[in-house]
Amino acid sequence: ASKKTKGRIMKTQTKPLDIRDFLHTKEAIVEYINEAYHDDDPRMFLIALGNAVRSKGVSKVAQETGLGRESLYKIFSGSASPKWDTLKKLLDNLGIEIYMRTKSA
């Protein structure tokens, strides 16, 4: 973005949006991951889960869950597919539980 000041154009410095800056509460993380789950692109769920884990700290989550840090990076980069027990450990660590309900018509 830029604006004019006495005939000169001054550029405004901006930084890229980092969603992790907004994932400080369990409620925010749940809402974010839930929206990603309902996205048409199934990769969005893992991207959102990865952002939530990164907001807490990958090393910390790896230590608390017993999962390898490198394995987590592979999952979140899309180069590895996680097993259900891995997803469950990550969600549990973030304080999130999944429940099922019938679809509304």
Where are these regions (language model features)?
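N-terminal flexible/basic segments that precede or flank functional cores
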Residues: A1-N51
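Recognition helices and adjacent regulatory flanks at domain boundaries
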Residues: L23, H38, V58, M100-T102
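Alpha-solenoid HEAT/Armadillo repeat architecture
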Residues: H38, R54, S77-A80
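Short basic helix-loop element that most often maps to the first helix and adjoining turn
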Residues: F45-E64
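Residues in the helix-turn-helix
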Residues: K60, S71, T86
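Recognition helix of helix-turn-helix/homeodomain-like DNA-binding domains
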Residues: G66-P82
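DNA major-groove recognition helix of helix-turn-helix/homeodomain DNA-binding modules
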Residues: K83-R101
